[in-house]
Structure formats: C-alpha cells, structure tokens
C-alpha cells in the first residue's frame, strides 16, 4: 500500500513540475506594464523581463528613476512617469500604453507600486499617513487595473498584483496591512468576475525583504518621529520603555530582511510567462514556513505567537 501511495505522490509532483514549466509562446511580442519601477521589486522585474526579451513598459514615479532604469536596459524598454494616486496621471499612462500596444493589447499588468510609512502602531499613526498608504497600495491598484483592463482583456493577458504576506496575516503597521488585505480581496473578486475573458490574475505575497520600503535608517527615523508627534496621553499610556523595547524589536526585524529580491521577481515572472500561473505566490522563506502555516492556526494561538515577545505598555492591566 505504501508503495502505491509513494508512487501516486511522486507522479503528482512530477506532473505538477511539468505543468509549472510550460511557457507561453512568442514572449518577445508581448508587452508588460509595471508600476513602481524606480527601485525595489519593480526595478528588478523590469530589468529581468527586458533581459528575457519581453517588451517592458516601465512606470516610474520620478524622471530620475526612469532615466536610471533606461541606462541599465535595452532599447526595447520604455518608461513613463506615473503617480498612482492621481487619476489624470493614470489616464495619461493608459493612453501612452494604448498607443504602444495597439490592437494586440497588453499582455501583462504588474501592480507593484507601494509604500510603507511609518512603521508604528495603529494608535500612533496619524490619519494622513494611513490615507496615503491606502491611496497608493490599494486605491492606486484598483484604479490602474480598471483603467488598463480593456487592454489586458484584448490580449487575454495577465494581471499580477503585489500584496504582502501581511495581507494574509495582519501584524503591525495597521494601515499597511489594511491596504494589502484590500489588494487580496480586490484580486479575488476581479478574478472571479472576469474568468470568462481569458484573463488570469495572480497575487504575489512577499515576506520581509530589504527594499526602499524597509530601509532601516529611514524606517526607524520615521518610527521615532511618529512617537515624538504622538499625543501626550498616548505616551503616558504606552511609556518610553515600551517604545524603546518595540524600537529594538523593529530594528532586529529590519536587519533580518532578505536581500534576495529574485525570490519575489521570479514569482512575478512565472505569473506572466507560465501557461499555468498560480493564483497566489508566497515569496520568501519566512512567508512559506512561518506566516502561511501561522494563518491556518486558531486565532488565539496565532495572536500568542505573534505578540509573545512584545513589551507591555506602562498602563497595561
């Protein structure tokens, strides 16, 4: 019996391996539009796809970022400036893409642009910072997707939305987690709504990686600033010792961020080029072996595991 079971499992993984490696044909003729290409995942993905021969349309927030990217890639790659929080900028970028892709449509849309600032507790976070994260990480994704959707539908292409493992397990930085949970929900809803048009939607959930968003110096400085600007009653409730302990925990976490960004961009590339893309990709060992298993535990147990090393506030009961 065990021999039959082992043979069945082996056959399953062999078929899975074969299925995962089926690649879309004529990649050199396909256009992919990527947001957030100034740095980080978007920048690396743009260079990675360009090296593979795809026609990359890279959206950068700044002209400086666009110029630097053009200097690192072939003449095939073209850039446009895009602020995903402004509808007029999205409309202009959509028209620009339309002029480039023509009747063939847009094969790939990668919603990668995102921000994480500041790293702090919900109660310390001001409304403006929360709204900025929602505007970029969630509303921007929705507006760019809906604007580009007719072009993607024409090509029967792919949409890749970059969420986070914190869109699966909410842990710290409330505004960021809320925005990423929203990306997950939007992606699931849209995937079901447009399933009959041949468009495939994938969600990429990176763990902790060292990018511009997790720059240690900037992140810790913003955390200090957030605490400094917190109302007096907040400081009395939590206490300076609580902040200092939490600051050290965050510092250690940022130091342990992975530097291998290819773990994420390889997932994005697979979602764009595979005949059978996955619905979800968990990128990074922390995502695969800690956060994903954690998401299936009873909530009370997950809460304990996530917060067991946290300090207690000054006025804790």
From Swiss-Prot:
Superkingdom field: Eukaryota
Span of the signal peptide: 1-17
Main subcellular localisation: membrane
Keyword vocabulary terms for this entry: Endoplasmic reticulum, Endosome, Glycoprotein, Lipid metabolism, Membrane, Microsome, NAD, Oxidoreductase, Signal, Steroid metabolism
EC annotation from Swiss-Prot or TrEMBL: 1.1.1.105, 1.1.1.209, 1.1.1.239, 1.1.1.53
Catalytic center residues: 176
Broad class of enzyme this protein falls into: oxidoreductase
Subcellular location(s) per record: Microsome membrane; Early endosome membrane
Reactions that this protein is recorded to catalyse: all-trans-retinol--[retinol-binding protein] + NAD(+) = all-trans-retinal--[retinol-binding protein] + NADH + H(+); all-trans-retinol + NAD(+) = all-trans-retinal + NADH + H(+); androsterone + NAD(+) = 5alpha-androstan-3,17-dione + NADH + H(+); testosterone + NAD(+) = androst-4-ene-3,17-dione + NADH + H(+)
Tissue/organ expression: Detected in liver and prostate (at protein level). Detected in adult liver, lung, brain, placenta, prostate, adrenal gland, testis, mammary gland, spleen, spinal cord and uterus. Detected in caudate nucleus, and at lower levels in amygdala, corpus callosum, hippocampus, substantia nigra and thalamus. Detected in fetal lung, liver and brain.
One GO cellular component, as annotated: intracellular membrane-bounded organelle
Function: NAD-dependent oxidoreductase with broad substrate specificity that shows both oxidative and reductive activity (in vitro). Has 17-beta-hydroxysteroid dehydrogenase activity towards various steroids (in vitro). Converts 5-alpha-androstan-3-alpha,17-beta-diol to androsterone and estradiol to estrone (in vitro). Has 3-alpha-hydroxysteroid dehydrogenase activity towards androsterone (in vitro). Has retinol dehydrogenase activity towards all-trans-retinol (in vitro). Can convert androsterone to epi-androsterone.
Family statement drawn from the similarity comment of this UniProt entry: Belongs to the short-chain dehydrogenases/reductases (SDR) family.
Designated name of the protein: 17-beta-hydroxysteroid dehydrogenase type 6
Gene giving rise to this polypeptide: HSD17B6
